[in-house]
Amino acid sequence: MRHRCRVPQLGRPADQRKALLRALTTELIRHGQITTTLTRAKAVRSQADKMITLAKDGSLAARRQAMGYIYDKQLVHRLFDQAQERYSNRNGGYTRVVRTLRRRGDNAEMAIIELV
């Protein structure tokens, strides 16, 4: 039974699921928006919000924690430099998920997740 299961399983083992979410979060921060399935977009939304909250904190411990999650070191530095001015007046809700057309091959629900 799946009582109180908060993370979507995404049809993968735990290590592959964590690696997928790390990769999607890294690419979202790098490009500003990505197109993926709706379930993946909803799963990556919380991780991206956590990384931006760490960047707003700006402490050394928060920077090290973000470096342990985001794959690109220069991207972490860029995120920490921009987050203070970009998200200073916003308390959460740093991403937006917009539904798009279904994927042609398998009719999967697609969405664009973007940084606000």
Swiss-Prot record:
The terms describing its cellular component in GO are:
cytosolic large ribosomal subunit
Which InterPro entries does the UniProt entry name for this protein?
Ribosomal_bL17, Ribosomal_bL17_CS, Ribosomal_bL17_sf
Keywords of this protein's UniProt record, alphabetized? Ribonucleoprotein, Ribosomal protein
Q: Which domain of life is it from?
A: Bacteria
Which residues are listed as membrane-spanning? none
Query: Which Gene Ontology terms describe the biological processes this protein takes part in?
Result: translation
Q: What Gene Ontology molecular-function terms does this entry list?
A: structural constituent of ribosome
**Protein name stated in the entry:** Large ribosomal subunit protein bL17
Q: Which organism is it from?
A: Gloeothece citriformis (strain PCC 7424)
